[in-house]
């Protein structure tokens, strides 16, 4: 079965748990996106995991990072929802 590319925004406790679960099931390749390089460094490298330091406030960069993914999941505070949704629409990915 081909793995679906999925982006997760937010590498805190919730985002990391979602990431680990999706990687463990074997159906997804995960791009974990966070504005904090330090936060991403805390997460061990795993097959199928790509980590990207990126701020969702960078609309163009974030939109470009989402392209080619099946969907994006948010594990960020509620006030980031609009920015993530706009980038998902622009990149034509599910949110």
Question: What are these model-derived regions, one by one?
Answer:
Residues 22-23:
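Aromatic pocket-lining residues of Rossmann-like dinucleotide-binding sites
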Residues 85-95:
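Beta-strand-loop-alpha-helix segment that lines the small-molecule cofactor/substrate pocket
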Residues 29-31:
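Short beta-strand element of Class I
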Residues 6-10:
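Conserved N-terminal Rossmann-fold NAD(P)-binding element of oxidoreductases
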Residues 36-39:
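Helix N-cap at the beta1-alpha1 junction of Rossmann-like dinucleotide-binding domains, i.e.
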């Amino acid at each position: 079965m081909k793995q679906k590319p999925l982006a997760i925004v937010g590498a805190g406790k919730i985002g990391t748990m979602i990431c680990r679960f999706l990687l463990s099931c074997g159906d997804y390749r995960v791009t974990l996106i966070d504005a904090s390089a330090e936060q991403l460094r805390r997460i061990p490298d795993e097959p199928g995991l790509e980590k990207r330091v990126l701020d969702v406030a960078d609309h163009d960069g974030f939109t470009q990072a989402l392209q080619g993914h099946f969907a994006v999941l948010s594990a960020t505070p509620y006030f980031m929802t609009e920015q993530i949704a706009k980038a998902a629409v622009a990149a034509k990915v599910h949110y």
